[in-house]
Amino acid sequence: MEEGELKDTDHLIDIQLDEVTFVRRRPEVEHERAVAIFDLLEDNHFGIKGFQGPFRLVLSLAENRLLFDIRDGEDKPLRKVILSLRPFRMIVKDYFMICESYFSAIRSMTPAQIEAIDMGRRGLHNEGGAVLKERLAGKVVVDHDTARRLFTLICVLHARG
């Protein structure tokens, strides 16, 4: 299945982060999580060959792996996709560093300086989304924006404190 083959029903109607991986996070990280989930549920393209949407998704981290627990609209398990976290490590690390700069900048820097940092943050989002889309190829089909928002949630799962 390719992105062009997605049907109107091929989308996510619910996204959860596994409670085992849930920790109390900084307000800025919680805001990122809430915005990513809201935006995903408003507009996403998510499909699996051999299954018709809509889908529910539970994301979790376990043993250095990212787990996509994909279910149908009535919460019946359909497929689990497990990805190595190794390809994401540097991007996630860089993303956290630039987010720290961004959160500091919004308190004290000029709008032009904040915009420059935000452009770097968006660039890392694009890179992380592209890596995710590539790693999901052959298993799950997502569009660019869906991949970017899912990458945000991968970063949230990595966030501590």
Swiss-Prot record:
> Pfam families of this UniProt entry?
UPF0262
HAMAP family reported in the protein's UniProt record: UPF0262
To which protein family does this belong?
Belongs to the UPF0262 family.
Q: Which NCBIfam families match?
A: PRK02853.1
What is the protein named? UPF0262 protein Rru_A2770
From which organism does this entry originate? Answer: Rhodospirillum rubrum (strain ATCC 11170 / ATH 1.1.1 / DSM 467 / LMG 4362 / NCIMB 8255 / S1)
